Amino acid sequence: MTLPAHARCVVIGCGIVGNSVAYHLTRLGWGDVVLLDKGPLPNPGGSTGHASNFIYLVDHSKEMTALTMDSVRQYQELGVFIQSGGIEVARTKERMQELTRRMASAGSWGIEGVSLLNPTQVKELVPYIDESMILGGFSTAGVGVVDSLRAGTLMREKGQAAGALHVAPKTEVTGIDVEHERVRRVRTTDGDIEAETVVITCGVWSPRVARMAGARIPLTPAVHQMIDIGPVPRFRGAKSDIEHPIVRDMDTNMYERQAGGDLEIGSYAHRPILYDPEDLPPVEQAALSPTEFPFTQADFEEQMQHALELMPEIVGDESVGVKYAINGILSLTPDGMPVLGESPDVKGLWSAAAVWVKEGPGTGKALAEWMVHGESEIDLHSSDIARFHEHQKTRAHVRARAAEGFNKTYGIVHPSEQWASNRNIRLAPFHARERELGAVFFEAAGWERPQWYESNAPLLEEFGDRITRRTSEWESRWWSPLINAEHLAMRERAGLFDLSAFTVFDIVGPGALASVQCAALRQMDVPAGRVVYTPVLSPNGGFKSDLTIMRLGDEHFRVVTGGAAGMADKKWFRDQMVGGAELADMTSSMTTIGLWGPRARDILADTTSDDVSNEGFKFGSCRTIEVGTQRVLASRISYVGDLGWELYVPIEQGLKLWDTLWEAGRPHGLAACGIGVYGTTGRLEKCYRAHGNELETEYNVVEAGMTAPRVKEEDFIGKAAHLRHREEEPAAIMCTLTVDDHRSKSGEKRYMLGREPILTRDRKRIVDRLGRGSYVTSAGAGPSVGKHILMAYLTPEHAVVGNRLLVEYMGERYPVTVAVAGATPLFDPENTRIRA
């Protein structure tokens, strides 16, 4: 086959994702797109070819739900979707509670046709189920099955019909050339193609292909067992592939679905079986296909018993035999999310990997938008390939987390649940001190961060009834009342915080100012010694990130951002840098300690002869001071809304700084405080927004209540959109709500955790003019104000202080009141403490 000598884009991989990316690129106006695969068409041998092809709509992740819903829309438009309905059944009370959570998520994301069923109702829809084995089910009418191979063919044909797509099956990639850190050429068995961009959509082979370019895609091939049994007498004469709802037996990590005259049974309950991409055979050597391995019967024995329990009529029928059984290979990542976006290793090299059939077309569309327009309609920050830190890309980490996550595919995962594998990778220099204080560690970007300290138990007695106690087992998981006690200790005296997980990078050189001006919404041409908190916008004026920037010199800026977003922010700034600017990652060479509270100044003053008075050290400024024997960069800024500083030192001096502050703080009642205070209680009392919660690309600065009086003259990414937003009436307004009554029908008090739908008093969903529904973006205690605080975007007519609404939580509706519309804090609304 003759290949073009040049392509604007080469898409490698003809599964559902590759076909979708290629089609949507041509739909958005790109020509000279080449789509190739080493396998034959229509089934080149990847995971698409053996996928079960059913799609459930509801996920607790807003991002994944949006990609799935868009995929279903596209499958329907292509005529390859059969709506069958689906039921997730529960064998336990805990699972029934989880199904009520899924009902709430459906409400938050606008999925209709959902209901909770009792066993009899499940039996009416799935007559071959043994209803005595279950307590109930969660029905989603919009569930269905697709013909993903046919969908891929139709997409290819659309691109070819437009004259913009060249398709090359049976063409293997042998190399990807990179020059000056940018992709230049794709080498194949049929010749070379000069390429401006390359998209790797190779599924389980993606890491191997990425390595050809010196890049990394962190995923591992893993086994998912499936069998087909039949012929099933009940399905004899079936007029379509599926006529009964698909069943997910959630407590056993299994599913059962009609497949014509057969029953397909799949499992995520067996032991994790992982492979390396190099272990996958070539197409010509595979017995069935490169991603269909021999079935290991021993791994399925227990699962077959579970299927027999649930569907004895079919599975127990001796006339129904096994017709097909495989260890199907699919992609797993260390955090369970796809790997999308431009590689941080090589410019022009894009990834669309670890994407399953259910979100394939939606992902292809979103990635194409990102490539063409610089962003997608759906916020993809949780799937961004740039999110991974270096240790998270290692083979050992990928395999450890993938193995742990595999059996949680249908698991009940708490919003705060922590990973157990591959911990203690990044430790603060004062980690031993924290352990001595009984720190309970949560992980952030590999860093072990104290969430609370068990040594603060005496504070529970000190603050007594001011501390909320949770009695519900669910809300008590991964939580302690000590968080609220530490919060009050900080508010009344002072708190010491481990902020080691910050990502810190310097931008220096003659082009430094122009680089940060381009990326930041706020004015960065400020005097040296100033600290600027700034949103970072996407081209359409949504939130790419939010962070602080210190100007340390005429040509020296220090960017400080969160650990989770750190690597993506680093790539974003690096991509915007102009000539004469350089970026240096300081994260592993510095450590940060936070000191806040009304006595923070007294504590710091006891360690230094420098002037730290309000007149001598204004809020929003930074400078180097001497703390004991150390030179410390002190930044007077606060994310908890109290007087204090972030203190930066070289990492080898961090222990000494901790000890110095701890000793100085003892007479002042200094308490070690965890991230439960920093990231939740302190933040929410001040109505501070958080990236990934309140701040997403789907919302703008005006809606978030973060507009400044003026817009700087200098250009920056998203400026045109931002100016337009300032002239328009916002479609939604960020509000702070408080819960009026926590009592459930049982009398137990319940506390929302986030992502619950907000409803009107007559129980109607609130949707703005752009189609975005209202849901709780953040939730947590406000110990100083004595309220449980929720944040949510509301339409202008509902964003009225005093307006009463409802929040749906665990199958019940609780009254809430709009306490703030906009940015005014609940606690210290005049900001007198932070500026004291």
Task: Put a short name on every predicted segment.
Residues L3-V17, V34:
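Beta1/beta-strand and adjacent pyrophosphate-binding region of the FAD-binding site
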Residues S20, Y56, D70, I176-P294, ...:
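Flavin-dependent oxidoreductases
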Residues T26-S47:
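Glycine-rich FAD pyrophosphate-binding loop
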Residues A51-L125, D251-E256, G260-G266, L274, ...:
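Dinucleotide-binding Rossmann-like beta1-alpha1 core, especially the glycine-rich loop
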Residues E77-L78, I82, K93-A162, H166-P169, ...:
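Flavin (FAD/FMN) cofactor-binding and adjacent substrate-gating region
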Residues S148, D251, A286, P290-I425:
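C-terminal catalytic lobe of FAD-dependent flavoproteins
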Residues H389-A836:
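Glycine/proline-enriched, intrinsically flexible loops and inter-domain linkers
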